[in-house]
Structure formats: C-alpha cells, structure tokens
C-alpha cells in the first residue's frame, strides 16, 4: 500500500538524499514537506524548538506581530525546500511556509510556485485570522495558480497566545475563493466537531453546482490517542474518504520512528474498528492527498 504523509516539516539542515533515505526507512512513497518558518532564519530560537514555533522577538515575547518579517527570509526558506524537492520531485512535494506579513509575500509565493516548482503554501495563523483582508490577495494569487493551501487549525503549542486564531470556523471566508483548495490540519483538535461542521458548510456552498468541496482534512496528530478513534469515526463518514488525509507531523529525520507507528494505528482503526474496505483505506493513505494536489487518482 502506498503511503503519502501530507504533513512534514523541514529543520533546515536536511538534504534531499537525507530525506529520501528516511522516507525509505519509514515506508513512505511520498511526503509533503513544508519549508522552515521564514522568521526563524533571522530570529533567536529555543534550543528545543524543532519546528520554529517560538522565535523570540526583540522584547523576548514568543511569536506575535513584532517579529521581523523579511522578504529575504521567505525567499531563503523557499530555496531550501526547493533544493530538497529537486532531488526527487515525484516523491518530495515541497510547500512554502509563508508569513503573510512579510513584504512582497504575494510575489514571493508566485516565485516559489512558478519559478521554483513548489506545490503550494503552508500557514499557521499567528495573531492574524484567515478572514483578515490582508489574506485576500494571497488567496487570489494561489487560486489563480491552481495550488492548495495547508493551514494549522486547532490548539497551537507555540506562537504565544495564538490558538484563538486557529478555530476552524474562522476559515469560512475562504468560500469567497471557491477555486482555492485548502486543508485544515490536526482535524482542528480539540475542535473536531467544529472542523467537521465547517467541512459541511463548504459542502453546502457547492451543493447542486457540480463543483467539489474545496476543503480537506489533514488528520495528522494533534488528536491524542484517547480521542483518535472518535475523531476518525466522525470525520470519515461525514466528509468521505476523498477529503480525509493521512499525516504524521514530524521532521524528516524522525519519520522512520514515527510514521510506521502512526500508519499502523490509523490502519487498525480504519480497518479493524470501522470496517473500511482496502480501497477506502488506500484513499486515506494516498488518494485523498492526490486529489488535494489536483492529481488524477
């Protein structure tokens, strides 16, 4: 069975050959690999801050709007993940982790996708909301380019007090950009029911139009094991297999340890507890992500 991890983070020091080796050890055919968060290239970080979620600003506060948002950092982050992707672009799908407050961000997103071949954009709402007007030119450009967006949603263990900006209902304004495919990560835990309801809202918006729901759900953990069965048992029947994707949420070097465990646990839930067919399980591990990226399945 092919497995595509829809949620993996660069650390910034990996090579494409490193990533492919770790993928092989983990049994992964393909990964979606997010670039570094650009401000971490010029801001201090905690030693244990693996993903760059808590860069310090000048006042010592974690995250937030007073960090330095530099265009050159966005470009450097894009260049690194593009270099990793270039080793095998059929297996490594790079996405730019974009900071919307960086100068020239719309142009840098276009450059990353058109000139560098990246597959889309990743964002975490950090003291901004998905419905803020500053986001609209970004949505328009990504919609024009036909690429997807991947958002963090749910509790946020970083960026200061930003969880309130990550509630799934805050993403409803994306329905004004109907050709923009987007995913909410972590099933928005602990707001799983709200996430699924938002998926239903986007479904209602396209009912009778012949258009596909523009929202996908990334099921990478955020849901601890105690909530995992309930979350999948709710999301899969309501949303359908084609819009519910498998993800791990780690850095490439940790894939050999983490990915097989997460895949086995989810497969046990889907097959053993929910009684899904082999074809349905394959859609979860591969086909849903392929559809998200606009590929024929």
What residues fall within each predicted segment?
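Mobile, glycine- and charge-enriched loop segments
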Residues: 1-10, 82-95, 201-202, 207-218
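Mid-to-C-terminal alpha-helical segments outside catalytic/metal-binding sites
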Residues: 1-6, 17-30, 34, 110-111, ...
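An N-terminally biased module of ancient metal coordination in phosphate/nucleic-acid-related enzymes
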Residues: 1-72
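Divalent metal-coordination and catalytic microenvironments
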Residues: 7, 23, 31, 81, ...
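Active-site environment of divalent metal-dependent phosphoester hydrolases
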Residues: 11-14, 38-41, 100-104, 129, ...
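Short, acidic/polar
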Residues: 13-22, 101-112, 231
């Amino acid at each position: 069975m092919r497995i595509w991890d829809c949620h993996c983070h660069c650390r910034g020091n990996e090579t494409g050959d490193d990533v492919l080796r770790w993928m092989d050890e983990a049994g992964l055919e393909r990964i979606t690999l997010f670039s570094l968060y650009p401000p971490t290239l010029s801001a201090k970080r905690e030693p244990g801050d693996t993903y760059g979620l808590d860069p310090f600003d000048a006042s010592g506060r974690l995250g937030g709007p007073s960090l330095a948002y530099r265009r050159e950092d966005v470009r450097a982050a894009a260049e690194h993940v593009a270099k990793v992707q270039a080793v095998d672009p059929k297996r490594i799908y790079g996405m730019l982790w974009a900071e919307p407050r960086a100068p020239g961000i719309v142009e840098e997103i276009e450059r990353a996708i058109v000139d560098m071949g990246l597959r889309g954009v990743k964002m975490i709402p950090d003291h901004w909301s998905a419905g803020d007007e500053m986001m609209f030119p970004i949505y328009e450009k990504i919609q024009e380019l036909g690429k997807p967006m991947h958002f963090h949603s749910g509790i946020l263990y970083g960026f200061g007090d930003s969880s309130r900006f990550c509630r799934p209902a805050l993403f409803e304004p994306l329905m004004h950009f109907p050709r923009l495919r987007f995913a909410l990560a972590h099933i928005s835990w602990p707001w799983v029911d709200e996430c699924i309801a938002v998926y239903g809202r986007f479904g209602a918006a396209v009912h009778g139009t012949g258009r596909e729901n523009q929202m996908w759900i990334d099921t990478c953990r955020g849901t601890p094991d105690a909530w995992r069965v309930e979350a999948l048992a709710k999301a899969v029947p309501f949303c359908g297999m084609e819009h519910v994707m498998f993800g791990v949420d780690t850095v490439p070097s940790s894939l050999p340890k983490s990915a097989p465990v997460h895949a086995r646990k989810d497969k046990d839930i889907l097959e053993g507890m929910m009684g899904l067919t082999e074809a349905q399980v394959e859609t979860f591990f591969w086909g849903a992500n392929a559809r998200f990226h606009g590929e024929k399945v």
